[in-house]
Regions:
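RNA substrate-binding interface of SAM-dependent RNA methyltransferases
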Residues: 97-174
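Short active-site oxyanion
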Residues: 22-25, 42-45, 62-63, 130-132, ...
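Glycine/small-residue-rich loop that forms an oxyanion/phosphate-binding "nest" at active or ligand-binding sites
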Residues: 56, 62-92
Length: 174
């Protein structure tokens, strides 16, 4: 099946937060990142080159489209497309605040650069931190640049957007 213009338009629309939020999805690109996320998030659809698909015959994704490198480059948000891209469903962000008392967590206030947030998530993953609490003004975790910069850490570190003063006040009750 060829990649339709509507699907390309949809993928490219996921660069905008309002579109990601409306459909509760996010975009991931590249063999390592997509490979890491496949085991952690539900995949809506996957687009890949025949080379990548032949190396990953075990896929359980229902909606898979085989494309040429040229077709992939039309859909990709990257300057240099990397064999595969996938659209995943965003997980539920609810959390029991008592998790803070049982584990090391981070709180981030007003981080604006997607690459910086992705790097923080990647480092948190390396140190075994499972939860990051972000102020509402922090950049969207599902921004394609953030997802790319996490290098898969987004699969293991959960981000929660909340009012940090309210979160800190609620900790006094724990």
């Amino acid at each position: 099946m060829a990649l339709s213009k509507n699907r390309i338009k949809y993928i490219r629309s996921l660069e905008l937060k309002k579109n990601r939020k409306a459909d509760k999805v996010f975009l991931a690109e590249g063999p390592k990142l997509v490979g890491d996320l496949l085991g952690h998030f539900r995949c809506r659809f996957l687009i890949a080159t025949s080379e990548w698909l032949s190396a990953h015959r075990h896929l359980t994704v229902e909606d898979v489209t085989e494309v040429s490198e040229e077709e992939l480059s039309r859909a990709s948000l990257l300057k240099t497309p990397q064999q595969v891209l996938a659209v995943f469903e965003q997980p539920d962000e609810s959390v029991d605040v008592s998790v803070i008392s049982r584990s090391l967590c981070l709180a981030l206030d007003d981080v604006q650069d997607p690459g910086n947030l992705g790097t923080i998530i990647r480092l948190a993953d390396w140190f075994g931190i499972e939860h990051i609490f972000c102020s509402p003004n922090t950049v969207d975790v599902y921004n394609p640049k953030t997802v790319q910069a996490t290098m898969g850490g987004i699969a293991r570190v959960k981000l929660h957007y909340t009012s940090l003063p309210e979160l800190i006040a609620s900790l006094e009750d724990i």
